[in-house]
Amino acid sequence: MSYLLRSDPVSRIHPEPQSLTSFDHFDLLPDSLLLLIFDKVADVKDLGRCCIVSRRFHSLVPFVENVLVRVDCVISDDDSSSSDENHRFSLNTASISDAGGAGGSFSALFRLVFAPIFKPFQMLGQILGPKRSSSSFDASFSAINDEIGVTHHSPTQVLKNFGEIRFLKIELPTGELGIEDGILLKWRADFGSTLDNCMILGASSVIQSNSVKNHENSVDEDNGNIPESFYTNGGLKLRVVWTISSLIAASARHYLLQPIINEHKSLDRLVLSDADGQGVLCMNREQLEELRVTPLSASSASKRTLVPALNMRLWYAPELDLPDGTVLKGATLVAIRPSESKKEVCDASWLSDAFEEPFGTVAKMLIKRRTYCLEMNSF
């Protein structure tokens, strides 16, 4: 018995759909939308993962406009494993002697190394590293398998082949200032070719309380005056150390940013912060361009930008009650501008916007108190 096999007319009219596994839905998305998504991703490690997905992703990532680089680790100066200068992001601080001439030295040398941990991140070094050529995706991908161990790349190297960055944020793993538990110390500095301004907020202790207070109705029993004990019990000396330490940390960060700023002329804004929230250095487009045109003046003592002569304003409260019930002991706010600056040191809008909440509220409360003027020479 024989059978006659005939083709199904229905299958000819309505063929089987293409297998989903052989169709890339990302091909339907325009490049502009993918770049918008990559801008939201921002983190350079996650962008490294994206590069492995496809050739198209690989080719688009260098055109991302918003980039975040998180520095993974801090390696001390005597760490012999980091002897290669091409794989360092160094931050140097200088020594500080107190007014009494004691050898109260604040000195530290850090090497901040961007160190990818997982295997996929090693491809980012191939894509964005300084020695990368226009090799194909397959060649770059095979380089991952040939890599042995974990390579280390500085932020400068990682950012080398990003050509369209407009907003760049680099985050250090910790703040540079070693402070005791319970002490509050925060700073924010703006730089051009030199320091434009700096704000420092500190407190000797922070006491958390469950009782909510209305600071609008509170009255300063001391009329905003600094008590005599502030000068005799080391309070003033401590604030001077806070101020100089913060300025040194800020100027060291600024010094290290110069090669990145020169390399990426598309930058509109640059922020260098730390995971502890201790200090923030900011530069806008005008300040970035100023640094490119006017080379910075380096300190002879260490690898940092020279701090110019300064005018400072200080506000102090022995005890400050915040609206949420938190109590700050020895609350201090210092506003700093170069002596040659034409801008007013006590500009209210600048002072109130320097810190995020709740610290912005602290600054607003302190500037209502009596203002004390100080000066500092260049260092």
Curated annotation (Swiss-Prot):
Q: Which domain of life is it from?
A: Eukaryota
Residues in F-box domain copies = 24-72
Disulfide pattern: none
Taken from the record, one Pfam family name reads F-box-like
Instruction: Name the residues that span the membrane.
Output: none
Q: Which InterPro entries match?
A: AUF1-like (IPR044809), F-box-like_dom_sf (IPR036047), F-box_dom (IPR001810)
Name of protein: F-box protein At1g30200
